[in-house]
Amino acid sequence: MSCTTIDFADYVSDGDSRLWPILGPNRGQRQAQPLAPLLVVLRDYILAHHALRFLPFNGSLRVLNLPPGYIATVYTNAKGRVVHTCHGHPRGGQWASFVSFIPHIIAILRGDVARCGCVLCLRHRGQGIPARKLPRPFWQIR
């Protein structure tokens, strides 16, 4: 069985490393996230949703890296919660999770970033999804 390999160095990326946050070496500071688990998530997502649409798929898939100009980071916030973010969008901003970054990666794979459906691209095109208004707590209902 042969393996299809995705190396994002071979793709045109719109990522901008100048927009990355400052990374620190100490615990609690923002650090680059190890890529191995993220690349497995990306591979599984591509296999589940997109493999046969735009890739020459030969039974298995391997993803080598993130698109150039992008970085996944991890840090611990003031409340002690571990926070994962992704950076490098050409218009700034950050994805709040790796999963919300995946639609942009898929757009890069397709070569069609102009029609990307990720949260940041929709926001910059003025098509952002409005925040959902939560219902009032039961004790405030009359």
Residue ranges of predicted features:
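Extended, low-hydrophobicity segments enriched in charged/polar residues
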Residues: M1-V83, I102-R142
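Alpha-helix N-cap recognition
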Residues: A96-F101
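Double-stranded DNA-binding cores of transcription factors and transposases
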Residues: H84-G88
